């Protein structure tokens, strides 16, 4: 087993949070090495690389870059596109953290003989009854625990999370107070890194631009389809089913004398069903690809909280495992706009207990 020394590999994005994390780790006596992953460079910008290198040099810590663009394309972006083509609503940040970012961090650390792993995530970690758990950050507005439900003990035991007890305003003040004015004024990242503004424009570029990368077979023809009501009656034409998500109201491009929302998406017929918000409510769902830290804290309990959207409403539920190996979630109160492909995360007693990917919202 690797020795637990004071060496730590820190994921450095060049932003405020990971930069402050580096300073906090140094103050705590750790020997810090920073690694900046090249996952996706929006508009081809590499300013984040230069900022991370400059900060590492100023702090006197080691720094490396790791080009993960190919694997990010294959595991995250292609997955993102495929899910929308299947009529689902993916959460790529969950997949990236659990299957790419943290495992890559561990792989590189292993090669360097480093035990501890760190990032600028706003989460905390707790050790209870023989298990490590992720716990929500002190700053509820910045808490990122929702995205980390898939991490297992081999990663959790190695994690250092210096930002978990800080608010964002405190982090900015901390950097400014130590003379890192540029770091303190960095803008927050918003949305998915490869389409921070609008996923639809990104999809249209990938799916509808025949000048795209045909070697990767990205181009797939998307034609206009039909909006239907719940009885199957035609309402209007739409741009193509991948450009809509369950629960969507805005951007439908139609005007009716009542509020309607996307209830169903049918890729095989290119049809999208619109209905009232009330009709979108569900009382149960099923999860695949799930992870649970400790089943005794979750299964059969009535006081579990489930979240299906980052920074959104919490709902009480009970959780069981089906004979087919899925997690069956029975909600105490109906929840609207549950979509296949979304992530669901479980909490109890202030701890993240696990989560999974929604695969069904009705018994079929």
Curated annotation (Swiss-Prot):
List the Pfam families hit by this protein, alphabetically: tRNA_Me_trans (PF03054), tRNA_Me_trans_C (PF20258), tRNA_Me_trans_M (PF20259)
Q: What Gene Ontology cellular component terms go with this record?
A: cytoplasm
For this entry, the protein name equals tRNA-specific 2-thiouridylase MnmA 1
Query: InterPro entries, alphabetically?
Result: MnmA-like, MnmA-like_C, MnmA-like_central, MnmA-like_central_sf, Rhodanese-like_dom, Rossmann-like_a/b/a_fold
Gene3D superfamilies for this protein: Adenine nucleotide alpha hydrolases-like domains, HUPs, Translation factors
Q: Which gene produces this protein?
A: mnmA1
Similarity comment text for this entry: Belongs to the MnmA/TRMU family.
Q: Where is this site: Interaction with tRNA?
A: 121, 342
- The kind of enzyme this is, by top-level EC class, is transferase
Reactions listed under catalytic activity: S-sulfanyl-L-cysteinyl-[protein] + uridine(34) in tRNA + AH2 + ATP = 2-thiouridine(34) in tRNA + L-cysteinyl-[protein] + A + AMP + diphosphate + H(+)
Output the Gene Ontology terms for molecular function: ATP binding; tRNA binding; tRNA-uridine 2-sulfurtransferase activity
Where do the segments described as Interaction with tRNA lie?
A: 142-144, 309-310
